[in-house]
C-alpha cells in the first residue's frame, strides 16, 4: 500500500470519528476503483490519546471493501469499544487523538504457536466459544516474550487459562498487518 492509499484511509477514519463523536451526518465512502482500497481484507482501527488507548475494534474477515471496513471500524472504535463505555471520547479530545490502522492478512492456523515472529505476527487464539487476539505491534509495545504474548492473549483477551495455547484443542492463528497511523490533527 502506498502513501496515497494510507492518506485516504487515515483521512476517512479521521472524518468518520469526527462525525460520529460530533453527531454530524455519516460519511459515504470515497468512490474508488483502486484495488488497494476495494480489496476485501480485515482491519483494525486503534485510537489513542497519548499513550492511553481510547478504542480498538476490528474484524479479521471483510464482508465489504477495505475503505468501507475502515469507516465501520472507526465508528466502532470511537463509540463501541466496551472498555470505554464509562469514559467515551469527547469532541474536545479529538485533536489529541492518534489514529492507527492495521490492514490484516488472512488468518493462518498454526500447530506450532512458538513459530510466531514477535513484532511481525499477530495472534488469534480460540477454544470453544472463547477467543481473543493481539495485533503484531502489541508484542513490540510490551516487550513480551513469545510465551508471554501467547499467555496474556489467552488469559486477558480470551478468558482462558494462561497456558491454554499449549492445549491441542486450542486453535492458534497467525496473521500479519500493515500498520500505519498519524496524529488526528496532522491528517489532511
Each language-model region and where it sits:
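Basic nucleic-acid-binding interfaces
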Residues: 1-188
Amino acid at each position: 500500500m502506498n502513501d496515497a492509499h494510507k492518506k485516504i484511509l487515515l483521512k476517512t477514519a479521521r472524518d468518520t470519528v469526527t462525525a460520529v463523536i460530533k453527531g454530524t451526518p455519516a460519511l459515504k465512502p470515497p468512490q474508488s476503483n483502486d484495488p488497494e482500497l476495494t480489496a476485501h481484507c480485515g482491519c483494525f482501527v486503534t485510537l489513542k490519546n497519548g499513550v492511553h488507548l481510547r478504542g480498538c475494534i476490528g474484524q479479521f474477515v471483510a464482508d465489504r471493501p477495505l475503505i468501507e471496513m475502515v469507516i465501520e471500524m472507526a465508528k466502532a472504535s470511537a463509540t463501541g469499544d466496551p472498555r470505554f463505555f464509562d469514559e467515551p471520547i469527547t469532541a474536545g479530545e479529538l485533536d489529541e487523538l492518534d489514529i492507527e490502522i492495521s490492514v490484516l492478512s488472512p488468518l493462518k492456523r498454526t500447530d506450532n504457536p512458538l513459530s510466531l515472529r514477535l513484532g511481525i505476527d499477530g495472534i488469534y487464539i480460540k477454544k470453544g466459544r472463547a477467543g481473543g487476539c493481539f495485533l503484531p505491534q502489541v508484542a513490540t509495545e510490551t516487550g513480551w516474550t513469545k510465551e508471554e504474548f501467547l499467555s496474556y492473549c489467552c488469559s486477558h483477551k480470551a478468558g482462558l487459562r494462561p497456558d491454554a495455547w499449549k492445549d491441542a484443542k486450542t486453535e492458534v492463528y497467525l496473521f500479519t498487518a500493515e500498520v500505519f497511523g498519524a496524529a488526528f490533527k496532522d491528517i489532511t
